[in-house]
A protein has these predicted regions:
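Hydrophobic alpha-helical transmembrane segments of membrane proteins
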Residues: 1-58, 74-146
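Alpha-helix N-cap/helix-start motif at helix boundaries, enriched for small hydrophobics
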Residues: 70-72
Length: 146
């Protein structure tokens, strides 16, 4: 299973999945819809699944001498790892914004949603819905997205 996860991280993952982790820094932009960070992380994961489909990664992996359930577990573990990394980055930046930068005028007079614990909860809901709808739908067919 760990070798399949390494394969997902090194070969099957789209570079966008890693680049879009930097969008967690949007948490620090005042007056910006910060939930867009979660959207970009899900978009990067979608691109990884699409690239894997175009490269016949599922067929290649199914031909390897591994259990078929481990293939699904490794793909899902990759998805959860990227989402947890993004969530942790957002959590660190949110805590920094709530403590060290709480008195900054650009954050106190913010018309949009401030970075707080509710924001982190909505990110978790967004990632959970992505896993429930997209990832589950992908593994019903594995050759059709969603």
């Amino acid at each position: 299973m760990s070798k399949l996860l390494k394969k997902e991280l090194r070969l099957a993952a789209s570079p966008l999945s890693y680049w879009f982790l930097a969008f967690a820094l949007m948490t620090m932009i005042p007056g910006y819809p910060i939930l867009v960070c979660g959207f970009f992380v899900c978009l990067g994961l979608f691109q990884s699944y699409q690239a894997a489909r175009e490269q016949n990664d599922v067929i290649y992996t199914a031909l390897l001498p591994v259990a078929k359930t481990d293939i699904v577990r490794a793909k899902f573990a990759f998805t959860v790892l990227i989402e947890c990394t993004a969530w942790l980055l957002c959590a660190v930046l949110t805590l920094m914004r709530m403590t060290a930068l709480s008195a900054a005028p650009v954050y106190t007079q913010n018309a949009m949603m401030n970075a707080n614990l509710v924001y982190l909860g909505w990110l978790a809901v967004l990632f959970g819905l992505f896993n429930l709808i997209f990832v589950r739908g992908y593994f019903k067919t594995a050759y059709a997205i969603g």
